[in-house]
Amino acid sequence: MALSTEQKKSILAEYGLHETDTGSPEAQVALLSARINQLTEHLKFHKHDHHSRRGLLLLVGRRKGLLKYLADNNVDRYRDLIARLGLRR
């Protein structure tokens, strides 16, 4: 259920600021969004998996905090990221 190494590398290559970037808010939010999407699909089939649901809520909270940080510090990067990820319709 976790992201494979290849999936992580492709996400980091697309959203990271440079090739080995793993710490920028954009890279972290992109990885969290991929994990959130995976867990959301899992929960569509396993509705009573409450442990995974709690994990999903923790990931959403972590992503929300990183997005808040990015919005407070650099609005242009924030708007670009949410547009690229398709968040906030």
Swiss-Prot record:
GO terms for molecular function: rRNA binding; structural constituent of ribosome. It comes from the Bacteria. Disulfide bonds: none annotated. GO terms for cellular component: cytosolic small ribosomal subunit. Part of the 30S ribosomal subunit. Forms a bridge to the 50S subunit in the 70S ribosome, contacting the 23S rRNA. One of the primary rRNA binding proteins, it binds directly to 16S rRNA where it helps nucleate assembly of the platform of the 30S subunit by binding and bridging several RNA helices of the 16S rRNA. This is Small ribosomal subunit protein uS15. It comes from Corynebacterium diphtheriae (strain ATCC 700971 / NCTC 13129 / Biotype gravis). The lineage of its organism: Bacteria, Bacillati, Actinomycetota, Actinomycetes, Mycobacteriales.
